[in-house]
Amino acid sequence: MNTQNAGKKVLVVDDDLDFLTQVQVNLEAAGFEVETAESQKQAEEYLVKNHPDVAVVDLMMEHPDAGFALSYHIKKKDPTIPVILVTAVTSETGLEFDASTDEERSWVKADAFLAKPVRIEQLLREINRFLEGK
Protein backbone atom coordinates (compact mmCIF):
# COMPACT_ATOMS: atom_id res chain seq x y z
CA MET A 1 0.00 0.00 0.00
CA ASN A 2 1.15 3.51 -0.78
CA THR A 3 1.41 5.36 2.54
CA GLN A 4 1.85 8.69 0.74
CA ASN A 5 -1.86 8.57 -0.13
CA ALA A 6 -3.04 7.33 3.28
CA GLY A 7 -5.86 9.46 4.61
CA LYS A 8 -6.51 11.13 1.25
CA LYS A 9 -10.21 10.82 0.40
CA VAL A 10 -11.40 10.40 -3.18
CA LEU A 11 -15.08 10.58 -4.08
CA VAL A 12 -15.84 8.60 -7.25
CA VAL A 13 -19.26 9.16 -8.86
CA ASP A 14 -20.45 7.10 -11.82
CA ASP A 15 -23.59 5.18 -12.76
CA ASP A 16 -21.47 2.49 -14.46
CA LEU A 17 -20.95 0.02 -11.62
CA ASP A 18 -18.13 -1.82 -13.40
CA PHE A 19 -16.18 1.43 -13.81
CA LEU A 20 -16.98 2.44 -10.23
CA THR A 21 -15.69 -0.87 -8.84
CA GLN A 22 -12.58 -0.89 -11.03
CA VAL A 23 -11.61 2.64 -9.99
CA GLN A 24 -12.36 1.97 -6.32
CA VAL A 25 -10.22 -1.19 -6.22
CA ASN A 26 -7.29 0.50 -7.97
CA LEU A 27 -7.40 3.68 -5.89
CA GLU A 28 -7.63 1.71 -2.65
CA ALA A 29 -4.63 -0.37 -3.80
CA ALA A 30 -2.79 2.95 -4.24
CA GLY A 31 -3.57 3.83 -0.62
CA PHE A 32 -6.53 6.19 -1.02
CA GLU A 33 -9.71 6.15 1.04
CA VAL A 34 -12.46 5.84 -1.58
CA GLU A 35 -16.13 6.70 -1.29
CA THR A 36 -18.44 5.90 -4.18
CA ALA A 37 -21.79 7.20 -5.36
CA GLU A 38 -23.91 5.97 -8.25
CA SER A 39 -25.69 9.27 -8.95
CA GLN A 40 -25.53 13.02 -8.55
CA LYS A 41 -28.14 12.74 -5.79
CA GLN A 42 -26.12 10.17 -3.81
CA ALA A 43 -22.97 12.25 -4.18
CA GLU A 44 -24.69 15.42 -2.98
CA GLU A 45 -26.02 13.55 0.08
CA TYR A 46 -22.45 12.38 0.82
CA LEU A 47 -21.10 15.92 0.43
CA VAL A 48 -23.44 17.33 3.08
CA LYS A 49 -21.37 15.67 5.83
CA ASN A 50 -18.08 14.82 4.11
CA HIS A 51 -15.17 16.60 2.48
CA PRO A 52 -13.20 14.66 -0.13
CA ASP A 53 -9.70 15.70 -1.15
CA VAL A 54 -10.59 15.15 -4.81
CA ALA A 55 -13.68 14.10 -6.79
CA VAL A 56 -13.83 11.94 -9.91
CA VAL A 57 -17.20 12.50 -11.58
CA ASP A 58 -18.86 10.97 -14.64
CA LEU A 59 -20.27 13.62 -16.94
CA MET A 60 -23.55 11.91 -17.85
CA MET A 61 -25.46 9.95 -15.22
CA GLU A 62 -29.15 10.12 -14.31
CA HIS A 63 -29.39 13.35 -16.32
CA PRO A 64 -27.27 14.35 -19.33
CA ASP A 65 -25.81 17.28 -17.35
CA ALA A 66 -25.56 15.55 -13.94
CA GLY A 67 -21.75 15.67 -13.91
CA PHE A 68 -21.67 19.37 -14.75
CA ALA A 69 -24.27 20.10 -12.05
CA LEU A 70 -22.44 18.03 -9.44
CA SER A 71 -19.13 19.65 -10.32
CA TYR A 72 -20.77 23.07 -9.89
CA HIS A 73 -22.15 22.08 -6.46
CA ILE A 74 -18.79 20.70 -5.32
CA LYS A 75 -17.00 23.91 -6.34
CA LYS A 76 -19.72 26.03 -4.72
CA LYS A 77 -19.26 24.12 -1.43
CA ASP A 78 -15.46 24.28 -1.60
CA PRO A 79 -13.61 25.70 -4.61
CA THR A 80 -10.38 24.02 -3.48
CA ILE A 81 -11.69 20.47 -4.09
CA PRO A 82 -10.27 19.35 -7.45
CA VAL A 83 -12.89 17.84 -9.77
CA ILE A 84 -11.92 15.44 -12.54
CA LEU A 85 -14.75 14.85 -15.01
CA VAL A 86 -14.67 11.57 -16.91
CA THR A 87 -16.75 11.02 -20.01
CA ALA A 88 -17.35 8.76 -22.97
CA VAL A 89 -18.88 11.69 -24.87
CA THR A 90 -15.63 12.33 -26.74
CA SER A 91 -15.37 8.79 -28.08
CA GLU A 92 -19.09 8.60 -28.86
CA THR A 93 -19.59 12.01 -30.48
CA GLY A 94 -16.17 13.40 -31.33
CA LEU A 95 -16.86 16.46 -29.15
CA GLU A 96 -13.89 17.31 -27.00
CA PHE A 97 -14.01 18.89 -23.58
CA ASP A 98 -11.07 20.62 -22.02
CA ALA A 99 -10.30 22.37 -18.76
CA SER A 100 -6.82 23.61 -19.55
CA THR A 101 -7.53 27.34 -19.44
CA ASP A 102 -8.97 29.58 -16.71
CA GLU A 103 -11.84 30.52 -19.04
CA GLU A 104 -12.81 26.88 -19.63
CA ARG A 105 -12.57 26.07 -15.91
CA SER A 106 -14.72 29.11 -15.05
CA TRP A 107 -17.80 27.80 -16.87
CA VAL A 108 -17.17 24.07 -16.64
CA LYS A 109 -16.29 24.06 -12.91
CA ALA A 110 -13.91 21.15 -13.39
CA ASP A 111 -10.16 20.98 -13.12
CA ALA A 112 -9.59 18.23 -15.68
CA PHE A 113 -11.39 16.06 -18.23
CA LEU A 114 -10.47 12.46 -18.95
CA ALA A 115 -11.97 10.52 -21.84
CA LYS A 116 -13.31 7.04 -21.19
CA PRO A 117 -11.99 4.44 -21.28
CA VAL A 118 -9.80 5.92 -18.55
CA ARG A 119 -6.43 4.30 -17.94
CA ILE A 120 -5.90 3.93 -14.21
CA GLU A 121 -2.33 5.24 -14.53
CA GLN A 122 -3.67 8.40 -16.15
CA LEU A 123 -6.28 8.85 -13.42
CA LEU A 124 -3.69 8.31 -10.66
CA ARG A 125 -1.36 10.82 -12.30
CA GLU A 126 -4.13 13.46 -12.36
CA ILE A 127 -5.21 12.78 -8.78
CA ASN A 128 -1.61 12.97 -7.53
CA ARG A 129 -1.03 16.18 -9.51
CA PHE A 130 -3.95 17.84 -7.75
CA LEU A 131 -3.00 16.51 -4.32
CA GLU A 132 0.64 17.63 -4.44
CA GLY A 133 1.28 19.77 -1.42
CA LYS A 134 -2.06 19.01 0.25
Where are these regions (language model features)?
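Non-catalytic signal-transmission and effector/linker regions of two-component phosphorelay proteins
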Residues: 1-9, 115, 119-134
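Two-component/phosphorelay signaling modules centered on CheY-like receiver
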Residues: 17-35
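Helix N-cap/capping motif at the beta->alpha junctions
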Residues: 36-45, 67
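Short amphipathic alpha-helix used as the core "switch/output" element in two-component signaling
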Residues: 45, 68-80, 100-102
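Active-site beta3 strand of CheY-like receiver
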Residues: 50-56
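Conserved phosphotransfer microenvironments
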Residues: 58-72
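Alpha4 helix (beta4-alpha4-beta5 surface) of REC/receiver domains from two-component response regulators
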Residues: 69, 90-114, 121, 125
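Hydrophobic/aromatic residues positioned on beta-strands within the core alpha/beta folds
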Residues: 86-87
